[in-house]
């Protein structure tokens, strides 16, 4: 077993890929009987300090319908200088530059350790990075001041040749001219009128040099100053002026009467930002960064009226079809998101307010373009300030951890087809023989566009086996998949990262144990969870839970060992043993349970779940719990109410929150001030240890989690109590004896009851 775990670990570290199955069933029928689809989690730009990019272009297969890239799985005839493509078997000539290759002098892309390789493309004009700030001015004074300071700080973090623009909005929308003369000029647009891209470009005077739409290319350097210099300027030229301009920003001057919301034209402001970049820099790396402190209340994209007595829509309103602005607003933002994705730009949303800001309607903007979504209470909190600062963090080479305008192309050997992808991407509608008719996620294509990428951005990619049951893949063969990610690096170079992997085929009837041993239950749980969350966007919550339950029961029936009608005989092997508890916690998670969460919160949680890597996704599904005591070093404990003991401190990491919880006795000792007495030095250290560990997590994570410090009986202890498995409740407390954790006041079923029920259904011949 350890060997497969090591194999999975090594592949993730080298290639950024985790497959649900690491030995593949050799026919379509057998693959469907496996219940969990053949799929993988791919982190296209996983950080690899040991992988410097090579300074030449990749060698492509000459077959026009294939164009796979030369890789270690290809067969090479060194004497004839020919190579055979491992996907279509086409024989190809090596280019002249490869004349000196031999068995002992191989290029990097043929060496097995370079199953992932990155190429640096030298040709083609380079375009600077573009950052367009879209700022809400209907904020409270201290909030606006804090936001202005964060924006001024961010200017110092941008590369000097980056282009920057500024749009502000309240009741009206202002597009600011950024000149070096120090005179403030802006174009003002009504916040109620929807404008086409052409109208926006005409009004801003961008049409003379705006390129014909069919020329999908970046503006050439000599065109750029004329086209956009008034609105997008290199930071090194206007740093001082823009800092002053941001400092002078005032609150929206339109009066807001009592009982009314400010009039916010978010939809028009975003539309103008998209139109401005569309006309000046199509297919160039650009970020639209929207900062908003409340819901859009007028014009296209409004999500609530200005009357405060009318609350913004809740889940209850949506279920009752009582959210009157939702469909129209969602349509507006979807149209903007699709236009932005077509142009290769991405949209970030930074929403800080105590009430909802319309993230439900606007979620498609970051979701489809690979932008960030940050949600907080105020721009004046360290949560926002540090999260915003982290966007501009640098990697080991001193480059930004951001990439732009990526396309992901997936190629498969002929026994496989691509069913779809789930992640921050849009389809490029590239059909081909390797595209399946059955869609899972965003399907019907073998290529996707990801406009904004960072080293942790992860996609779930789903496949299906082609071969019929009566003509399975021959034994001993290997199936192969190649992932080709072309992107604009933050240094503005064009790069291509290529990952080529292979796995063995096995006959599911004679080698089921072999397939079973190669099951990656962590990857499978995340891939199934992504499918569930994807379905939850368009289906009723209970239907999604029923679907997940059915899949779990079928999986247990297929791979469990049991005697018919005898639940006590049920066993799962080590490679499946954790999977049911992942599903138990997933069912209770905020991704599938909307109770107690606003529509905006649900959208925020789902946004992050659909893009994080495997480790972070597992923390979201099943939070990690550490226990601190006098009995030894901190240790991970079960996410269970039995772990909540009076003489322990607990640290829980849910990804979105870090909770420190003091047990009853510890809380009393702290209240009595023992930590300040020299003879109780060890107690002081015990209190400090979880704080230090929490600080470490807070420093590393994006977005920065909410930090909660609570104790037994504290109101915020609910964050911990709602996550742990309620093995002890008010119903069964007295059956447990005395010193065993805290009872949870809930009617939710515990993991034990869930497992008992699962065993009963799995062994029943009726189900």
Curated annotation (Swiss-Prot):
GO CC entries: COPII vesicle coat; cytosol; endomembrane system; endoplasmic reticulum; endoplasmic reticulum membrane; perinuclear region of cytoplasm
Which Pfam family is one of those matched by this entry?
A: Sec23_BS
Tell me the CDD domains matching this sequence.
Sec23-like, Sec23_C
* Example GO molecular function: zinc ion binding
N6-acetyllysine: residues carrying this PTM: 564
| Protein location | Cytoplasmic vesicle, COPII-coated vesicle membrane; Endoplasmic reticulum membrane; Cytoplasm, Cytosol
UniProt binding sites for Zn(2+): 61, 66, 85, 88
Question: Topology versus the membrane, per the UniProt entry?
Answer: Peripheral membrane protein
Gelsolin-like repeat positions:
634-720
Under the heading InterPro entries, the entry gives:
ADF-H/Gelsolin-like_dom_sf (IPR029006), Gelsolin-like_dom (IPR007123), Gelsolin-like_dom_sf (IPR036180), Sec23 (IPR037364), Sec23/24_helical_dom (IPR006900), Sec23/24_helical_dom_sf (IPR036175), Sec23/24_trunk_dom (IPR006896), Sec23_24_beta_S (IPR012990)
Any one biological process term the GO annotation gives: intracellular protein transport
Q: Which UniProt keywords apply?
A: Acetylation, Cytoplasm, Cytoplasmic vesicle, Endoplasmic reticulum, ER-Golgi transport, Membrane, Metal-binding, Protein transport, Transport, Zinc
The residues forming a coiled coil are none
PTM annotation (N-acetylalanine): residues? 2
Matching SUPFAM superfamilies: beta-sandwich domain of Sec23/24, C-terminal, gelsolin-like domain of Sec23/24, Helical domain of Sec23/24, vWA-like, Zn-finger domain of Sec23/24
Q: Which domain of life is it from?
A: Eukaryota
Q: Tell me the protein family, please.
A: Belongs to the SEC23/SEC24 family. SEC23 subfamily.
Summarize the subunit comment. Answer: COPII is composed of at least five proteins: the Sec23/24 complex, the Sec13/31 complex and Sar1. Interacts with SAR1A.
Q: What does this protein do?
A: Component of the coat protein complex II (COPII) which promotes the formation of transport vesicles from the endoplasmic reticulum (ER). The coat has two main functions, the physical deformation of the endoplasmic reticulum membrane into vesicles and the selection of cargo molecules for their transport to the Golgi complex.
* Protein name (database record): Protein transport protein Sec23B
**Source organism of this protein record:** Mus musculus
Please spell out the taxonomic lineage of the organism that makes this protein.
Eukaryota, Metazoa, Chordata, Craniata, Vertebrata
Identify the gene encoding this protein. Answer: Sec23b
């Amino acid at each position: 077993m350890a060997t497969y775990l090591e194999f999975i670990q090594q592949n993730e570290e080298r290639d950024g890929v985790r497959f649900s199955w690491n030995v593949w069933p050799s026919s379509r029928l057998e693959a469907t009987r496996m219940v969990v689809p053949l799929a993988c989690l791919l982190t296209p730009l996983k950080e690899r300090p040991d992988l410097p990019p090579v300074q030449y272009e990749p060698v492509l297969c000459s077959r026009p319908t294939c164009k796979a890239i030369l890789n270690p799985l290809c067969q090479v005839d060194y004497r004839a200088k020919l190579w055979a493509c491992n996907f279509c078997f086409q024989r190809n000539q090596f280019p002249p530059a490869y004349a000196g290759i031999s068995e002992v002098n191989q290029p990097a892309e043929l060496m097995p350790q370079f199953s992932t390789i990155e190429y640096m493309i030298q040709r083609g004009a380079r375009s600077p990075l573009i950052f367009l700030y879209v700022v809400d001015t209907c904020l409270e004074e201290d909030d606006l001041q804090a936001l202005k300071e964060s924006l001024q700080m961010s200017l110092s973090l941008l590369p000097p040749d980056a282009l920057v623009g500024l749009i502000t909005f309240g009741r009206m929308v202002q597009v600011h001219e950024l000149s070096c003369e120090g005179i403030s000029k802006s174009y003002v647009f009504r916040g109620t009128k929807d404008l086409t891209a052409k109208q926006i470009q005409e009004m801003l005077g961008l049409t003379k040099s705006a390129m014909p739409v069919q020329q999908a290319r970046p503006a050439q350097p000599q065109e750029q100053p004329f086209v956009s210099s008034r609105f997008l300027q290199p930071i090194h030229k206007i740093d001082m002026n823009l800092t002053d301009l941001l400092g002078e920003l005032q609150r929206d001057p339109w009066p807001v009467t009592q009982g009314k919301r400010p009039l916010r034209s978010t939809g028009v402001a975003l539309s103008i930002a998209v139109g401005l970049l569309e006309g000046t820099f199509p297919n160039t790396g650009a970020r639209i960064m929207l900062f908003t402190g409340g819901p859009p209340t007028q014009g296209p994209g409004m999500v609530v009226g200005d009357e405060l007595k009318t609350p913004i829509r809740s889940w209850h309103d949506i279920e009752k079809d009582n959210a009157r602005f939702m469909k129209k607003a969602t349509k507006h933002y979807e149209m903007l998101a699709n236009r932005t994705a077509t142009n290769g730009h991405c949209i970030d949303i930074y929403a800080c307010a105590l009430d909802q800001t319309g993230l439900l309607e606007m979620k498609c903007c970051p979701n489809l373009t690979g932008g960030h979504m940050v949600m907080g209470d105020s721009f004046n909190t360290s949560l926002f300030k540090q999260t915003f600062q982290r966007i501009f963090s640098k990697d080991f080479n001193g480059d930004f951890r951001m990439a732009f305008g990526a396309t992901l192309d997936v190629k498969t050997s002929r026994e496989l087809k691509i069913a779809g992808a789930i992640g921050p991407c849009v389809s490029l509608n590239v059909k081909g023989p390797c595209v399946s008719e059955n869609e899972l996620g965003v399907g019907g294509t073998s290529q996707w566009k990801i406009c904004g990428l960072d080293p942790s951005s992860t996609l779930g990619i789903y496949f299906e086996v082609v071969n019929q049951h009566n003509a399975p893949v021959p034994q001993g063969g290997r199936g192969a998949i190649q992932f080709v990610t072309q992107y604009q690096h933050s240094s503005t170079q064009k790069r291509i990262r290529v990952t080529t992997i292979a796995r063995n085929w096995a006959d599911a009837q004679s080698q089921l144990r072999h397939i079973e041993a190669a099951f990656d239950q962590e990857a499978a749980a995340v891939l199934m969870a992504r499918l569930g969350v994807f379905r939850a966007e368009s289906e009723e919550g209970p239907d999604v839970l029923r679907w997940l339950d059915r899949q779990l029961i079928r999986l247990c029936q297929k791979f469990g060992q049991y005697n018919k009608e005898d639940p006590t005989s049920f066993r799962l092997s080590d490679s499946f043993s954790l999977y049911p508890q992942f599903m138990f916690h997933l069912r209770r998670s905020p991704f599938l349970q909307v109770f107690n969460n606003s529509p905006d919160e649900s959208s925020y949680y789902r946004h992050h779940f659909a893009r994080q890597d495997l480790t972070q996704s597992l923390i979201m599904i099943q939070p990690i719990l550490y226990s601190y005591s006098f009995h030894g070093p901190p240790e991970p404990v079960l996410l269970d109410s039995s772990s909540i003991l009076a003489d322990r401190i607990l640290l829980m990491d849910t990804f979105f929150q870090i909770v420190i919880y003091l047990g009853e006795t510890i809380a009393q000792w702290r209240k009595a001030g023992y930590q300040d007495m020299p003879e109780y030095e060890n107690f002081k250290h015990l209190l400090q240890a979880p704080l230090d560990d929490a600080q470490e997590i807070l420093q590393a994570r994006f977005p920065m989690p909410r930090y909660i410090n609570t104790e037994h009986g504290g109101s915020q202890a609910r964050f911990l109590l709602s996550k742990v498995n309620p093995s002890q409740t008010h119903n069964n407390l007295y059956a447990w004896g005395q010193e065993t954790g805290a009872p949870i006041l809930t009617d939710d079923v515990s993991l034990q009851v869930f497992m008992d029920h699962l065993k009963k259904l799995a062994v029943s011949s009726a189900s």
